[in-house]
Amino acid sequence: MDLSKFRPSSAYDSPFLTTNAGGPVYNNVSSLTVGPRGPVLLEDYHLIEKLATFDRERIPERVVHARGASAKGFFEVTHDISHLTCADFLRAPGVQTPVICRFSTVVHERGSPESLRDIRGFAVKFYTREGNFDLVGNNVPVFFNRDAKSFPDTIRALKPNPKSHIQEYWKILDFFSFLPESLHTFAWFFDDVCLPTDYRHMEGYGVHAYQLINKAGKAHYVKFHWKPTCGVKCMSEEEAIRVGGTNHSHATKDLYDSIAAGNYPEWKLFIQIMDTEDVDKFDFDPLDVTKTWPEDILPLMPVGRLVLNRNIDNFFAENEQLAFNPGHIVPGLYYSEDKLLQTRIFAYADTQRHRIGPNYMQLPVNAPKCAHHNNHRDGAMNFMHRDEEVDYLPSRFDPCRHAEQYPIPSRVLTGRREMCVIEKENNFKQAGERYRSWEPDRQDRYVSKWVEHLSDPRVTYEIRSIWISYLSQADKSCGQKVASRLTLKPTM
């Protein structure tokens, strides 16, 4: 163990097996017993330590995004956007920032087949000179619900039945029938994009609106888009069944093998920019996470490229203990008023403290690469060696000072304290536009998924009728096609 770096090092390795305390182990095969056939003795310390360590190897899996794979690389700025943001890592073309990226499925468990229909996570941690920036997104640009109060129920509805531990669509369709805004996400979820061939051939989105702030303090809303340079590829249902039956880790293997062979995955980063004064000029709320921004009005602007050129060294240390948090931003970036984003800022840090421990940010994969200093101290599994006497601020014995203030949005927000739904719900327009943009065979696959799951015997006539109504309000012909195959009449 290299004590200066708190990591295993060949220079510090013992030539023989030892206990955790460094004591020599001369037999790693046979337990200490009373005679060759007698009972095992508790004084076999190495046996007890070995079993106790094994019993505690696993940590709680993520409540969402449990199944995933990670890789390292860099982000390079290719286009100047310094007029939009004072973020140091975006300061000029050519600037490179080390990153680690994690791809995942959202609902399914750790160890589940990566070929299952699901939204995919697309999270990038930028180790910038001003701290970590975590862009925690998905491979679809929208989400099922716009308010985090529904998020726990959303995930429970999507996850297996608590009685049988089987994922059942009657639960999903029952719950989301109360959330008409979810139809837009279903227009992605039941589409081909939720069966990506692998992680290298899928897009990524920041999902939420954020804000970019320049040196003058001018703010713009921004949305982030990742576009794979090797194109988007998806599987059919039949291909997904075959691939999953052959190798349940096919996407992880593809990512690892591609990087090992020097075929480095690459994505281009684009942004959409909206003036903060223009949010009321649309027929929807631009800060509603169930909506996309029209690219004909707010075109994609190129920013940079993401290249993954290094495999992780240890799956547990750099995938299972890897922790993302949308609350991690840097100067020149800020949150929007998106209700779901605002609550993710708390929820992600909270779940990491539960899953990994209160000092999860000390782990090498999570710690910033830049200099950092605060008085967050001690706690379970703290391994930071600190010898200072002053553990408070301000102090005349500690030269640490406040950082220089950086620009943040200065808009004045007023309103009553209330729990309410946004004014411009417009739940069906974008779902219909997406459906009409597809070729007929793609439309038919989408219709077939609805028919398949609405045919579940536990889906009631009322639930079917509600979904036919939603689909018809999005696109009349789509609703009619689903209804005719279910022998129901659309209500719209």
From Swiss-Prot:
GO molecular function: catalase activity; heme binding; metal ion binding
Enzyme class, UniProt record, top EC level: oxidoreductase
Signal peptide interval: none
Activity regulation as described: Inhibited by salicylic acid.
A cellular component term, taken from the record's GO annotations: cytosol
Keywords associated with the record: Cytoplasm, Heme, Hydrogen peroxide, Iron, Metal-binding, Oxidoreductase, Peroxidase, Peroxisome
Cellular compartment(s): Cytoplasm, Cytosol; Peroxisome matrix
Primary site of residence: cytoplasm
Record's subunit section: Homotetramer.
Family: Belongs to the catalase family.
Protein name: Catalase isozyme 1
Taxonomic source organism: Nicotiana tabacum
